[in-house]
A protein has these predicted regions:
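Compositionally biased, low-structure terminal segments
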Residues: 34, 89, 162-168, 183-186, ...
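Predominantly extracellular/lumenal beta-strand repeat domains
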Residues: 2, 10, 51, 99-100
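C-terminal helix/juxtamembrane-tail motif
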Residues: 205-222
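EF-hand-based Ca2+ sensing modules
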Residues: 22-31, 53-83, 94-120, 124, ...
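Acidic Ca2+-chelating loop motifs
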Residues: 39-50, 65, 76-93, 133-144, ...
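Amphipathic alpha-helical assembly/oligomerization segments
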Residues: 126-131
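Plant-biased recognition of short, low-complexity, intrinsically disordered N-terminal tails
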Residues: 1-34
Length: 222
C-alpha cells in the first residue's frame, strides 16, 4: 500500500552536514540505499525496496503505519511510491541514521501519537500523495478505506471512522477519492464532533461529507 538549486549548492549542503557534530557515516547510509534501490533506476527506492526495508525492520507494510511515518520523516515527497537518493540521504542526516540497527531503534518514535495536530495533518496528506499511482490524482475507494482504517485509528472516534468507511464503501457513485475529499474528512472530524450541529447551508464541505451526514441521519431514524 502505498525553488531550483544547483548541483554545487546541493554538494555544499551535504558537505556542511558532514562537518556537523554527530554526523553520520555517509558511506554506510549510501550502502543501505544501494541495497534497497531499484535495479532499473538505482537513483530511487521503489515499492520492492520499501518492502525489503520492512522485512529488515520486521514491519508489515500492509498494516503497520510506522513505515509510512518513516518515509514521511525521511522526506519522501518528490514522486508517489518511491524515495529518491537525495531525499533518503537528507533524511538519514536529519534522523541520524546510518545502520539498520539505528532504523530499528527509531521505530518506537514513529508512533503517530507523538505527532501534534499540525504534524499529523501534514503526514495525513502525505499518505494520500504517496499512494497515488502514476499520474492519477485520485485513489481507488478500496485503497482509501484501507488507508483510513490504518492511518486514523486512535486519531478519531471509532464510531466516526467505522461509519464513514461503511458509508464510502456502500456509495456506488464514488469509485475514486480526491485529495480534497481525503483532507476534508480529517478537518470535518476535528470541527464537527457532534453531527447535530452540522449545517449544510453554512458549510463548504465536499458533497461527500454532506451525503455522509444525510446517511447518518437516515441511519439514526431506523
Amino acid at each position: 500500500m502505498w525553488g531550483s538549486s544547483s548541483s554545487s549548492a546541493k554538494k555544499s549542503r551535504r558537505k556542511s552536514k558532514s562537518s556537523m557534530s554527530g554526523a553520520i557515516d555517509e558511506a554506510a547510509a549510501e550502502a543501505i540505499f544501494a541495497e534497497l534501490a531499484d535495479e532499473e533506476d538505482p537513483t530511487v527506492i521503489e515499492l520492492d525496496g520499501i518492502a525489503t526495508l520492512c522485512e529488515k525492520l520486521d514491519l508489515d507494510p500492509e498494516s503497520d503505519i510506522r513505515i509510512l511515518v518513516l518515509l514521511w520523516k525521511l522526506g519522501s515527497n518528490e514522486k508517489p511510491a518511491q524515495i529518491s537518493k537525495e531525499e533518503f540521504m537528507d533524511g538519514c542526516h536529519n534522523l541520524q541514521l546510518d545502520s539498520i540497527e539505528k532504523f530499528r531503534n527509531l521505530l518506537p518514535a514513529l508512533d503517530t501519537g507523538f505527532l501534534d495536530q499540525d504534524e499529523f495533518k501534514s503526514f495525513y496528506k502525505f499518505c494520500f500523495q504517496f499512494n497515488r499511482q502514476g499520474t492519477h490524482r485520485t485513489l481507488d475507494k478500496d485503497m482509501v478505506v484501507a488507508l483510513w482504517q490504518m492511518v486514523l485509528k486512535d486519531r478519531i472516534p471509532d464510531e466516526r471512522l467505522e461509519t464513514f468507511c461503511e458509508f464510502t464503501e456502500t456509495q456506488k457513485s464514488y469509485t475514486r477519492i480526491t485529495l480534497d475529499q481525503w483532507t476534508s474528512f480529517l478537518d470535518f472530524c476535528h470541527e464537527c464532533e457532534d453531527l447535530s450541529t452540522y449545517d449544510e447551508s453554512m458549510s463548504a464541505w465536499p458533497v461527500l461529507i454532506d451525503e455522509y451526514v444525510e446517511y447518518m441521519e437516515e441511519k439514526q431514524k431506523k
